[in-house]
């Protein structure tokens, strides 16, 4: 079952697995009674035993034996789990009178994001170095700014969006946002691209433009929409849910470049523009190759190499097209 198509069903069985004392996550494998009640579950079960994990066949054999010999006990346990989920899902009816609505939750969440804001690299620093596109969080900050006039909420949003646009998490040539950055600088992505990330991020960009009317955010949103239309839309109008991180069995191979490859493909003149703009070096920044990223704007780089800015932009566009 596609959990993105039925998140409600996914949520129920995820709660069941956690109630059984197992670690939640995906892929989620849950074994059910004929009536659909959860008996046992977990995430990944390998084809053969390894790292103290039972194989998928081991789990099947165990469950067949248990169901055959202890069906009454299993049924009792499954009903207890269902009762637990039902109770935990029950919420007191709330008065929906608008006068009773509170923005306490928004205020607390805004303060949480503010406290975890990475002032140097932007985005939010929590327990690990990984940084995920915080699209919904940025939308909340925009709403907080709109309601209260809090300038910091807007500044945090703008800085985070720009840091991701210029970082390695964004495919500087083909477009599209990777699933997350494995470092706090937004440089080294997990190269998989998810449809929902790009759609939600586009929404955050459009909402930012609605607030500040700065064309760079509308332009970035348009770039992402073009990427979705070109690479994540099938000929019959359906959407692909993701682009794989691997190319020819190697993670990220399609997205990283050596200096020699760039010079060979682009030619001397165009390469002389692309190499400094995308911070390409002989040594590289990822396993001997380069994840393209931007540290300085085009005007600055054009001035450094002594080129007219208009000519510089033409060569840069030529580099992207090649």
Predicted features along the sequence, with ranges:
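Replace the tail clause
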Residues: 1-322
């Amino acid at each position: 079952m596609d959990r993105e198509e039925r998140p409600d069903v996914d949520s129920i069985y995820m709660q069941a697995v956690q109630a059984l004392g197992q670690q939640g996550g995906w892929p989620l494998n849950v074994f059910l009674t004929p009536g659909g009640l959860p008996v046992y579950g977990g995430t990944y079960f390998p084809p053969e035993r390894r790292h103290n994990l039972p194989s998928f066949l081991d789990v099947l054999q165990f469950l067949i034996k248990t169901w055959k010999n202890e069906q009454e006990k299993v049924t009792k346990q499954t009903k207890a789990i269902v009762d637990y989920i039902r109770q935990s899902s029950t919420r007191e009816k709330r008065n929906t009178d608008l006068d009773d609505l509170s923005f306490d939750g928004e205020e607390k969440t805004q303060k949480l994001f503010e406290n975890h804001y990475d002032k140097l690299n932007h985005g939010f620093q929590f327990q690990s170095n990984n940084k995920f596109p915080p699209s919904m969080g940025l939308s909340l900050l925009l709403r907080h700014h709109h309601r209260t006039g809090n300038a910091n909420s807007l500044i945090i949003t703008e800085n985070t969006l720009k840091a991701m646009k210029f970082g390695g998490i964004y495919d500087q040539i083909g477009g599209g946002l990777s699933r997350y950055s494995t470092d706090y600088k937004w440089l080294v992505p997990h190269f998989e691209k998810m449809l929902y990330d790009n759609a939600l991020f586009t929404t955050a960009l459009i909402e930012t433009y609605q607030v500040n009317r700065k064309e760079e955010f509308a332009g970035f949103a348009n770039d992402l929409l073009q990427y979705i239309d070109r690479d994540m839309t099938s000929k019959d109008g359906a959407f692909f849910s993701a682009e794989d991180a691997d190319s020819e069995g190697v993670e990220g191979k399609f997205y990283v470049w050596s200096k020699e490859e760039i010079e060979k493909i682009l030619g001397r003149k165009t390469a002389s523009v692309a190499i400094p703009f995308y911070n390409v070096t002989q040594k590289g920044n990822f396993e001997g190759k380069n994840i393209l990223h931007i540290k300085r704007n085009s005007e600055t780089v054009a001035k450094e190499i002594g080129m007219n800015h208009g000519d510089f932009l033409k060569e840069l566009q030529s580099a992207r097209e090649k």
